[in-house]
Regions:
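Short aromatic-glycine-enriched beta-strand elements
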Residues: 25-29
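Structural detector for short beta-strands of small beta-barrel domains
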Residues: 12-23
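Canonical P-loop GTPase G-domain recognition
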Residues: 131-188
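Beta-strand/loop nucleic-acid-binding surfaces
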Residues: 35-50
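Helix-rich effector regions associated with P-loop NTPase G domains
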Residues: 8-13, 48-53, 57-62, 69-93, ...
Length: 313
């Protein structure tokens, strides 16, 4: 259990730390010796995110963030009409969906595009493998994503349920020595997964919420959990399965972020083909030949229009 530090002796020396929770502009920082304290940003633009490595200075009420170290990557989510970063320095993203209730393919596609844009490896976890018929239907729905090279991991996340232990063993191998952000809509089993992987997670979440003054049952905090005592593997939990921030992406970049579309762009007659109406379009030809899912192509058109409108403002 972390050692909480409400206040430290004032010191002019900078200290290293890891941001393990955030709520608004307040963050919880884990120090190099395992202590935790509340830190506040210095200035409006010095906003730290969960996963950030920072340099902080002790103050009377905790610490102030003096420097955010260079980030390997950033993941974004949507905030009204803007894209807003919410996690940094990830090795992979685990997108958890379930056989029931039926998942939104649009939300899944957006999450994958956000990961591709940030150069973060995505994994898809398909939960409720114990529901044979719905699971078979959901697995078929994910076949285009397997064809794109995305790994789909079957899971049965049910405390004490048949297949749960073997599911977790296989997943733990994927999480080993990595920082993984886990995302999923309501009903996908994200809370169950976290509680199975991290005994005492609920109590720790309550302590963090109290420390950040957000209330014990907050749903707005992004939280970092260590998966092992050696602190080599970590899981980041972010609330909900919100629309992913894609408005920072230029429309012309979109085909390269959708592997099934990108595969066929080299066959287009025109270098600036939008893949919507031009003659000699390799992407449209691939749709007609059944090499690209019609639903995926439809989503490409919808998102291209959305990004084109967003980039006008």
């Amino acid at each position: 259990m972390p050692c909480w530090v409400p206040a430290l002796t004032l010191s002019p020396e900078l200290n290293s730390g890891l941001v393990v929770a955030s709520h608004g502009r307040h963050v919880l920082v884990e120090t190099s010796d395992g202590r935790r304290l509340i830190c506040h940003p210095r200035g409006k633009k010095n906003t730290a995110l969960v996963g950030d490595r920072i340099q902080w200075l002790a103050t009377g009420d905790g610490g102030s963030i003096e420097k955010i170290e260079a980030r390997r990557n950033l993941l974004y989510r949507q905030d009204e009409i803007r894209s807003k970063s919410f996690a940094a320095n990830l090795d992979q993203v685990l997108i958890l969906v379930a056989a029931e209730p039926e998942f939104s393919e649009s939300q899944l596609a957006r999450a994958l595009i956000a990961a591709e844009a940030a150069h973060i490896a995505p994994l898809i976890g398909l939960n409720k493998s114990d529901l044979s018929e719905p699971f078979a239907h959901a697995s078929l729905k994910l076949e285009p994503y397997r064809c794109m090279g995305y790994e789909v991991i079957p899971l049965a996340l049910k405390p004490g349920g048949a297949g749960t232990e073997s599911s977790l063993d296989g997943l733990k191998d994927k999480l080993h020595n990595k920082v993984t952000l886990v995302l999923g809509p309501s009903g996908a089993g994200k809370s169950t997964l976290i509680n199975l992987l991290i005994p005492g997670a609920q109590a720790l979440t309550g302590e963090i919420s109290t420390a950040l003054n957000t209330g014990r049952h907050t749903t707005t905090s992004t939280l970092w959990y260590w998966l092992d005592d050696s602190h080599h593997s970590a899981l980041i939990d972010s609330p909900g399965f919100q629309e992913f921030g894609l408005h920072h992406i230029e429309p012309v970049q979109l085909p390269a972020l959708m592997p099934d579309i990108q595969t066929h762009t080299g066959n287009c007659r025109f270098y600036n083909c939008t893949h919507l109406h031009e003659p000699g379009c390799g992407v449209r030809a691939a749709v007609e030949l059944g090499h690209i899912s019609p639903r995926r192509y439809e989503f490409y058109g919808e998102l291209l229009q959305e990004l084109s409108q967003a980039n006008r403002y």
